[in-house]
Amino acid sequence: MTGSPATLAKLGSIMQISYVPEDYDAALDYWTQKMGAGPFFHTEKVEVENVKYRGEPSDIQFSMAIGYWGDIQVELIRPNNGAPSMFKDWRKNGLQGVQHLCLIIDDLDHARALTAEAGGEVIQEVSLPGGVGGAFYADYGGGPGTIIEYLQIPQAGLDGFAAMRQMHLDWDGKTNPVIGKE
């Protein structure tokens, strides 16, 4: 098997569009009030372990909000410290729009091998607390907005995403547009 584009595409379907907006709160307002996405679930301090950015350990701290827009998960990320990360670099470079897309996969090692075969570069990687999963972000050289996140999470995480999506389907578009944010 080779890491051809067709092989990479078979790893999974895009389930998330992620942004690292200049103004996190304005982005939440845009997605909830203009686009009808939500409700969003805000986490002030995302817990990740064993973070590496471009192969070096990093103590990134960031906030995240996740909501659904139909079947697509929308993720907003706000870097909260100056530690090296692709999120910090995105903001430092003044980039706007989609930062990365995410696929849920079953085997990180397999995805990593296919990424290497296709000439992709793993630019950031994280483990979830307790070793229950993880993610890596690969750059295939397509420019801003073309980074792919490969995420492996346990069934409980998938169930959580399904519950968020169901809340979106049942949501009135007004009540509690952002859950967990003061």
Predicted regions and their residues:
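Glyoxalase I/VOC metalloenzyme domain signal
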Residues: 1-15, 19-41, 54-121, 132, ...
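Conserved catalytic-core motifs of GNAT/GCN5-like acyltransferases
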Residues: 41-45, 126-127
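Residue-level detector of flexible, active-site-proximal loop/helix-junction positions
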Residues: 46-47, 129, 157
